[in-house]
């Protein structure tokens, strides 16, 4: 296991049990109903007098069969076209009247593995509004009307969305997903579906998807805001109890893993509409097992990745500032790729001038190889440590200013990924300890395990225009081979460590112009007359 190997080289590994779960924040009320539905409730007054209401369905487009492509997203639309208790457009009309505007505050989103419905900034001054918001979550769980005439009416809306979405950026995203999810179901799901399928699917196909996957054991309700936690919990328990539990033989979600590839998978997508040239290099690896996400192991894993990306991005920024830089900008990431839950990656990306992708690719591949061979220096590590500590200190200092949406996202992630949801004090203590405890040898050991020459995916997106020459797959492979066999020097850390003003230097002062006392603060303000180098 990657994190175990990295942890083994830290000097303070015996100070605590890395398999210990991270305790949950006691200010969030959680529970599971008999039908399997999970809930999270928290009182928060940022902003005062408002609350966010969410329901997460832990299913999405990847649960579609071939004849249902696009129907997870279609179903999301239907949730706003009539439910058991709010037929027709009553749902949106009511929420608009109380200030919850469609698009800004009332919305939903369909992904490959999740579908989320949300009402944000809902006023909580009247109990009736809270009751109505919970009733809407109830209907979104299991009581969407799916009236035949509404389904047929919505076909045109979604086909228009397909048309407007089908731009160069979306097409390039789909090409990237096809490369990353090659030989899996992810290669063949585009979220919105295809024109012929949207025109001709039978109503029963949509109903079948709905009945199979919209069920409480794959659902979490989240309410965060200026509410009475006890009262909301009682309302949820009462209101959601009529949602039926799934049958014992109900279908279970399939865990989809991406197969290894020995040779690089290369995707080159050019488009006359594309703005800018970009090349991405992914080094795939399995995601950390979900059961480890809530352990100290998982948090340490994240901190090590933060060290690695912080140091490498500093190197890439240093290169980009040179007059002859091979790219306009570059970056490195490590961890989730945001689409396939079972897949993580070490990712390098470069944005270049049009026609300069080959040079950009050689540069980022060289930097990747440099990290693999030599790792990072102690000086780089110390600067990264200071940076990470500043971030942790800033988060802790702002702990009382967290808005509803930040808490909501934490709880959604806890439900879908088993990531931790500690209180601010626990998070600060754990992160500050790990930042200080981890050493450069641990980060370098980790880097060697997640950077290698197999399981690579190379994705090129660039304009298709006369005069712009983009690299072929063969040329990219040749660059890769060239760098892999090249003699590469280790990174030289030339950062100035000495103070800008040597110790003991006597500086010539400026005359004092005026002083001012502040009795309240007990301070003295001093203004200087700054001398100019030249008088005219």
What residue spans do the PLM features occupy?
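Buried hydrophobic packing residues in well-ordered domains
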Residues: 36, 55, 73, 117, ...
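Extracytoplasmic
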Residues: 26-28, 34, 48-52, 66, ...
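Proteolytic maturation boundary segments
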Residues: 14-41, 228-305, 309-317, 321-323, ...
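Bacterial N-terminal signal peptides
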Residues: 1-8
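Acidic/histidine-enriched alpha-helical segments
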Residues: 88, 92, 96, 145-163, ...
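Scaffold signal of the M16-like zinc-metallopeptidase fold and its non-catalytic homologs
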Residues: 81-83, 108, 112-113, 129, ...
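Structured mid-domain segments that build the active-site/substrate or prosthetic-cofactor binding neighborhood
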Residues: 298-377
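Active-site-adjacent, His/Asp/Glu-enriched structural segments that form or flank metal-binding
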Residues: 47-49, 57-170, 200, 205-218, ...
């Amino acid at each position: 296991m990657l994190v175990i190997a990295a942890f083994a080289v830290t000097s303070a590994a015996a100070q605590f049990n890395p398999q210990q779960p991270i305790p949950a924040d006691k200010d969030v009320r959680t529970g599971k109903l008999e039908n399997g539905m999970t809930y999270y409730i928290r009182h928060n007054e940022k902003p005062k007098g408002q609350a966010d209401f969410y329901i997460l369905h832990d299913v999405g487009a990847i649960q579609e069969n071939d004849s249902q492509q696009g129907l997870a997203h279609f179903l999301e639309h239907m949730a706003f076209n009539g439910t058991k208790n709010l037929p027709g457009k009553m749902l949106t009309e009511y929420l608009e009247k109380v200030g919850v505007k469609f698009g800004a505050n009332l919305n939903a989103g369909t992904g490959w593995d999740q579908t989320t419905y949300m009402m944000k900034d809902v006023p909580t001054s009247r109990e009736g509004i809270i009751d109505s918001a919970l009733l809407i979550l109830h209907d979104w769980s299991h009581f969407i009307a799916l009236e035949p005439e509404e389904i047929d009416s919505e076909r045109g809306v979604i086909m228009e969305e397909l048309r407007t979405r089908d731009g160069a950026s979306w097409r390039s995203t789909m090409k990237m997903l096809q490369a990353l999810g090659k030989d899996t179901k992810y290669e063949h799901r585009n979220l919105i579906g295809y024109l012929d399928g949207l025109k001709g699917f039978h109503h029963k196909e949509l109903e079948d998807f709905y009945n199979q996957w919209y069920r409480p054991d794959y659902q979490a309700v989240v309410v965060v805001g200026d509410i009475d936690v006890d009262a909301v919990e009682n309302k949820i328990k009462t209101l959601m109890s009529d949602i039926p539990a799934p049958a014992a033989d109900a279908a279970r979600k399939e865990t989809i893993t991406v197969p290894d590839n020995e040779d690089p998978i290369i995707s080159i997508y050019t488009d006359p509409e594309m703005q800018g040239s970009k090349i991405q290099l992914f080094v795939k690896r399995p995601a950390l097992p979900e059961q480890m996400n809530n352990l100290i192991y998982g948090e340490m894993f994240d901190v090590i990745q933060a060290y690695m990306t912080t140091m490498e991005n500093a190197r890439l920024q240093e290169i980009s500032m040179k007059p002859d830089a091979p790219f306009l900008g570059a970056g490195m990431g490590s961890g989730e790729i945001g689409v396939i839950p079972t897949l993580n990656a070490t990712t390098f990306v470069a944005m270049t001038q049009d026609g300069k992708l080959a040079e950009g690719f050689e540069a980022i591949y060289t930097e990747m190889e440099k990290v693999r061979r030599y790792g990072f220096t102690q000086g780089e590590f110390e600067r990264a440590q200071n940076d990470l500590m500043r971030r942790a200190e800033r988060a802790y200092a702002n702990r009382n200013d967290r808005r509803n949406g930040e808490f909501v996202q934490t709880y959604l992630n806890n439900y879908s990924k088993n990531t931790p949801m500690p209180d601010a004090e626990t998070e600060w203590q754990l992160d500050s300890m790990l930042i200080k405890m981890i050493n450069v040898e641990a980060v370098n050991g980790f880097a060697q395990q997640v950077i290698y020459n197999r399981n690579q995916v190379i994705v090129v997106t660039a304009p298709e225009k006369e005069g712009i020459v983009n690299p072929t797959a063969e040329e990219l492979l040749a660059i890769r081979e060239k760098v892999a066999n090249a003699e590469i020097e280790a990174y030289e850390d030339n950062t100035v460590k000495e103070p800008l003003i040597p110790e003991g230097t006597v500086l010539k002062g400026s005359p004092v112009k005026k002083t001012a006392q502040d009795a309240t603060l007990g301070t003295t303000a001093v203004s200087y007359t700054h001398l100019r180098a030249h008088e005219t």
